Amino acid sequence: MKATVVIPTYNRASRLRELLSCLVHQDQETLAQVVVCDDGSPDDTRAVANAFEGKLPLVYRHQEDRGFRAGQARNMGISEARGDIIMFVDDDVLVAPDFVAAHIAAHRASKRTSVVLGYRHRSHEATVIPPTLEHIVASEADDRVVEIGPDGAGIAAHKMPWMFVYSCNFSVPRGTPELSFDERFLGWGLEDIDIGYRLWRAGNPVIVAPRACVLHIEDVAPRDPFRCEERKLPPTYDSYVRNAVHFMDKHEDAAVRAWVRNDLRWYVRDEERGAWVKNGYENDVEAVISACRAELRARAGALAPTQADARTEAL
């Protein structure tokens, strides 16, 4: 069994170099491909990818910069994949030498086609490349550990296991139905929860591979608005709130609606800033949803082109 590793990236050439260096240390017999999916980077991302030609079975794909389109970028990787399983990792993580093998082992051990997720621990400091698994586990723990345990055993009884599927670290067998990101999610947030939900609804259990951890190196200016908020930086929740309403509206599931509504009660439209903000007290959820639906309708005629329309280039 071999894996295709799909890496969406934008303007993080130095981080990408570190991740690719980690992948060089994997058992190369486990790697079918490493697909770098460039979301229109203006930096030297292409040159970094080129530098690993011959060291990794690397494929480079590029789409025009039309805003944050991580889902479209990952779909480029899916279309290129030749491995038995497709692994998704973000461009700002580091992995231990047995990372790919840990994902493959989890799939081999599963008696069914499964969604395999690994934890994402955090660090604010650089580390040796590749980091050891022990170093990763000793870093700031993934929030999901609290809910489903260090070994992930708690996910089996969880009513909404799809909510734990983060695109920074999960894998699925190639050819699994529903294995495609919804390209109507634009900007940061929830395209990964959506694909996790659809895969789960299609009958694929979500399981945890405890050894398949990644170490997320925190950016000075993170794209995640929740991390911005934690670090006292001005967060932008616009795409997250719109994507949450899109996620809720596309699925006729009471659990999804309740999950989204529970979250949206904390947001309000700041007309002075022209942005959605998280203000810390409960608001009229229906007003938030109605306003977001109006924004989504207004944007419907000007959505970014799909991955099929994007320019792609091979090394």
Regions found by a protein language model. Give the residues of each.
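Conserved donor NDP-sugar-binding/catalytic core segment of glycosyltransferases
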Residues: 98-138
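Non-catalytic, C-terminal membrane-associated alpha-helical segments of glycosyltransferases
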Residues: 238-239, 256-315
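Acidic donor-binding loop at a coil-to-helix junction in glycosyltransferase catalytic cores
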Residues: 188-195
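A conserved acidic beta->alpha catalytic loop
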Residues: 22, 38-47, 93-94
